Amino acid sequence: MNVFTTLQQFVPQQKISKVAGRLAASRHPWVKRTFIRSFAKAYDVSLDEYERQSLNAYESFNDFFTRELQDNARIIDASINGIVSPADGMISQLGQIHDHKLLQAKGRDYDIGQLLADSADGDYFADGSFATVYLAPSNYHRVHMPFDGTLIKTRYVPGTLFSVNNTTAANVPDLFARNERLVCLFDTAYGKAAVVMVGAMIVAGIETVATGKISRTDDIQEADHDMSFKKGDELGRFYLGSTAIVVLPKAAKTEWQATMQHGSTVQMGQLLANAKI
């Protein structure tokens, strides 16, 4: 590991994230105004595509960070078997899962069963495919459905809170299988599929339309669901968030778009792949 990632092992990750969460949720005029304006300036945030176009229109930093897009700001690919990006961001990695292994960064992989925190689910997706989308601070931070499906289970997995970026992906072993995350499992036209929302340093929380805001616990927490979604529907959001990983079964026979590769910039709803079913 380099110095940046080594230091993160020794800082109180949970305490830092807890404090960040309290500040981000504060509605105190000075606190919210200072955080929102400083963040918008630091990351050159434009509100042109958003429903509320004044920095003063937000009730807290969290409200600003999870700001909603204007209607029709994103076009959802309508192809029947198309699989779309769940978020605005950058393709960190994508491709096939080979014998349970997903690519994290060049020369570094990790186990699908560990990511999903379930060995049976890991076996099911052992030779499937995946796409990892990293959400930068300036991006739209809501996560949407990459396919039509019925949510059947959520699994909260406690973990570390390393920051997520190219440096940590290259240096922290099993980064996505170690960080706090929420696994969402769906029944789809091509079998079971998953969307994994991965937390990171100072991520103040993860919320979905099915679960509400997730409460941090020391143990894995599972819940059964029966909620149908259409491609492009909002699934959840990050409060100072991180990464979304789409996991597809072998039966989907995923064919990735030639333009989609490591480092590609994507928007929510943009076509990533087609399922050949």
Swiss-Prot record:
Pfam families according to UniProt: PS_Dcarbxylase
Membrane topology per record: Peripheral membrane protein
Enzyme class: lyase
Subcellular location: Cell membrane
GO biological process, one term: phosphatidylethanolamine biosynthetic process
Cofactor(s) this protein requires: pyruvate
Recorded catalytic activity of this chain's protein: a 1,2-diacyl-sn-glycero-3-phospho-L-serine + H(+) = a 1,2-diacyl-sn-glycero-3-phosphoethanolamine + CO2
InterPro entries per UniProt: PS_Dcarbxylase, PSD-B, PSD_type1_pro
GO MF, one example: phosphatidylserine decarboxylase activity
Domain of life: Bacteria
Keyword annotations from UniProtKB, A to Z: Cell membrane, Decarboxylase, Lipid biosynthesis, Lipid metabolism, Lyase, Membrane, Phospholipid biosynthesis, Phospholipid metabolism, Pyruvate, Zymogen
Annotated active site: 88, 144, 242
Pathway: Phospholipid metabolism; phosphatidylethanolamine biosynthesis; phosphatidylethanolamine from CDP-diacylglycerol: step 2/2
Post-translational modification Pyruvic acid (Ser), affected residues: 242
Main location: membrane
Cofactor note: Binds 1 pyruvoyl group covalently per subunit.
Site residues (Cleavage (non-hydrolytic)), renumbered to this chain: 241-242
Post-translational modification: Is synthesized initially as an inactive proenzyme. Formation of the active enzyme involves a self-maturation process in which the active site pyruvoyl group is generated from an internal serine residue via an autocatalytic post-translational modification. Two non-identical subunits are generated from the proenzyme in this reaction, and the pyruvate is formed at the N-terminus of the alpha chain, which is derived from the carboxyl end of the proenzyme.
Function (record text): Catalyzes the formation of phosphatidylethanolamine (PtdEtn) from phosphatidylserine (PtdSer).
Alphabetized PANTHER family for the sequence: PHOSPHATIDYLSERINE DECARBOXYLASE, PHOSPHATIDYLSERINE DECARBOXYLASE PROENZYME, MITOCHONDRIAL
Family, similarity comment: Belongs to the phosphatidylserine decarboxylase family. PSD-B subfamily. Prokaryotic type I sub-subfamily.
Quaternary structure and partners: Heterodimer of a large membrane-associated beta subunit and a small pyruvoyl-containing alpha subunit.
HAMAP family reported for this sequence: PS_decarb_PSD_B_type1
Protein name: Phosphatidylserine decarboxylase proenzyme
UniProt source species: Psychrobacter arcticus (strain DSM 17307 / VKM B-2377 / 273-4)
Lineage: Bacteria, Pseudomonadati, Pseudomonadota, Gammaproteobacteria, Moraxellales
